[in-house]
Amino acid sequence: MDLPAIQQALRDAGYDGWLFYDFHNRDAIAARILKMDTTRFASRRWYYYIPASGEPQKLVHRIEPWRCDHLPGAKHVYLPWQQQQSLLRAMLGDAKKVAMQYSPNNAIPYVSIIDAGTVELIRSFGVEVVSSADLVGRFEAHLSMDELKIDRSFVNDMLDDSQDKALVEGVI
């Protein structure tokens, strides 16, 4: 994760921060950008907030306090849901506009991962939730060389016509 580049992109977009949230490893975008360990089941909610300026903050459940330990920033630990909400509100501070994996009217379903209840919760703090789609496009890992080799292998195995192969390889 390139924290300075993310923070610069947030400032350029006029966003106060980017709030990542996950439960049960549902947000593959967050997992890839933040390099989360998805081999261990996430049974509790966690949050990671990258402000446009300043130190990131993480909010994790007491049962899984290690969840975001590899990420920079201050760690807050919650147990009851009331504490989770009050710490989350405090973590967002004076933020007015925060990006999340949300897409208005589900226009980009690939990015529309955050559930409506979580969006409502963040809005209840007086924070506008905006789509992280542009940020995701900029910071999510793209195909590695190994993945490209797999795709080329698929093309070679599945297509017989050399013109079709050339066309598909040009797209890849």
Predicted regions and their residues:
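N-terminal accessory/capping or targeting/presequence segment of soluble
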Residues: M1-L87
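Flexible, acidic/His-enriched mid-domain "rim/lid" segments that flank
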Residues: M1-P4, Q82-I172
